[in-house]
Amino acid sequence: MLTSNKISSLVIDTLRKQTGEQNIAVIFLYCDYQAQKDQSAVNMIGSLVRQATLREPTILSEIKRAFDKSKREGGDGLQLPDMVKLFGKVSSYMEVVYLCVDAVDEMLPQHRLEFLRALQQILQDAPNVRLFLTGRPYIRAELDKYLTEKTYAMHIIADQGDITRYLRQKMDDNDDQDPGLMTEDLKNNIMATMAEKASEM
């Protein structure tokens, strides 16, 4: 069964293989509901800047100057508009930049909206940036609001048969390690509950 992060990982791996040594960057973020407080828009865009800079180290001095200037002016660091501009500068050194963002729905709503606005600005300012984003269907209206131009949405829904086979395999593996731990009724109950929950996602 492919989960959101496995789909993103496949996309990232495929892009990396296809781009090889070309002047193309593949950079990514995995959002996690357990780290929501750390996933502010400025931190997320900052992570993209960091990853892009690793691909294009010649711009390091310019980024350092921007950080130093921000500190001298009494700031705590670069703000979101500054990070967005920096990302645009870094990405201009590359032919194409692929941004892969997994599980954007797991960000806190206020951070997610700021992040989507920042991505919107990046896509407007940097025509060489391509975005691959995953999230649950309930954020579709937000995506439509901020990322409407030139977007293609694909709904991937878990197949009940795949879920059943995956769960059965995991429970059989568990039986091999600890036989008799689960009764057949418990297994069937787990499978029914998980299949129902998956269909609600």
Describe the residue ranges of each PLM region:
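Conserved NB-ARC/NACHT P-loop NTPase core of NLR-like innate immune receptors
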Residues: 1-201
